[in-house]
Regions:
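N-terminal, post-signal-peptide region of Sec/Tat-exported proteins
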Residues: 43-87
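Amphipathic alpha-helical scaffolding segments comprising HEAT/armadillo-like alpha-solenoid repeats
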Residues: 28-38, 59-71, 91-103, 122-134, ...
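Bacterial N-terminal signal peptides
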Residues: 9-21
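Boundary at the C-terminal end of the N-terminal hydrophobic targeting segment
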Residues: 22-27
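Short inter-helical turns and helix N-cap capping residues of alpha-solenoid HEAT/ARM repeat scaffolds
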Residues: 42-43, 74-75, 105-106, 136-137, ...
Length: 264
């Protein structure tokens, strides 16, 4: 599925501007040089139009003037708009300024910065997102966990397990995306210790992956069958109903057998 966050960020950026249709029309007529010059203005509205123009232009050359203006200081709403524009541009060159913003005093700014890091995927993104797993804000911690899953940061597995154990539920789907067969034992150790509604997303991701061997999936289903709770029966039923595997697929058959045993 294509990443829709840059589209959403652009829509949010436009929505921040008063009289959005008028401002958008004006921004569309601005060149890169003009937008860059607007960022040097002391006028809130001019800076706002300059930021929006750079997002609409979509040029990688917009990253440097945006980063410079961010470092010079911006009003809170303009800072958020500038980060959203960097997200729209999706360029790795934005990494240094986004790393700086990921430690900003305001959690709203840190959240946007973490989301932008995941979208831009600069070098060092995995380290920055792993650090953000310990942020004081639960929203930032959750965004960091989601980002690690999205960028495929397999080096973050241990950090994600720790975050999951410490109550960051968003680490669950990331673990489901990133766990390798050798990590599955650790995933299964969480069953019965972590609420199953949080484990459900981990298992759904894990069982749905094509790169996970059938043998590993069979081990997961065998452990679920041992626990044999009604909610596990429901989960397995939903898994079978959503599966596109043929009737003779060993994983599907194991799930169906487990459903029958749990129902007795």
């Amino acid at each position: 599925m294509p990443d829709r966050r840059p589209v959403i960020a652009l829509a949010a950026l436009i929505a921040l501007v008063p009289c959005a249709p008028c401002a958008t029309a004006a921004a569309q007529d601005v060149t890169l040089a003009q937008a860059t010059e607007m960022l040097r203005s002391t006028s809130h509205d001019e800076i706002q139009t300059g930021i929006q123009s750079l997002g609409l232009l979509g040029s990688p050359a917009g990253v440097e003037p945006l980063a410079a203006r961010i470092r010079d200081g911006l009003a809170p709403d303009l800072l958020e708009a500038a980060i959203d524009t960097l997200t729209v541009l999706g360029r790795a060159e934005a990494g240094p300024v986004l790393f700086e913003l990921s430690t900003h005093r305001r959690p709203e700014v840190r959240l946007r910065a973490v989301q932008a890091i995941a979208a831009c995927r600069p070098r060092g993104a995995d380290r920055a997102l792993m650090t953000a797993l310990s942020d004081a804000s639960p929203d930032v911690r959750g965004a960091a966990a989601r980002g690690l899953g999205e960028i495929g940061a397999t080096a973050a597995i241990d950090s994600l397990f720790l975050a999951f154990d410490r109550g960051v539920p968003e680490a669950g789907p990331a673990l489901g995306r990133l766990a390798r067969p050798e990590h599955v034992t650790r995933v299964l150790e969480s069953l019965g210790r972590v609420p199953f509604d949080q484990m459900r997303v981990v298992l759904t991701e894990l069982l749905g992956r094509r790169d996970v061997p059938s043998r590993t999936k069979l081990d997961v289903i065998a452990r679920l069958a041992e626990m044999a709770t009604p909610e596990i029966g429901t989960f397995l039923q939903e898994f079978v109903e959503a599966s596109a595997a043929p009737a003779n697929d060993p994983v599907r058959r194991a799930a169906e057998d487990a459903i029958t045993r749990i129902a007795r």
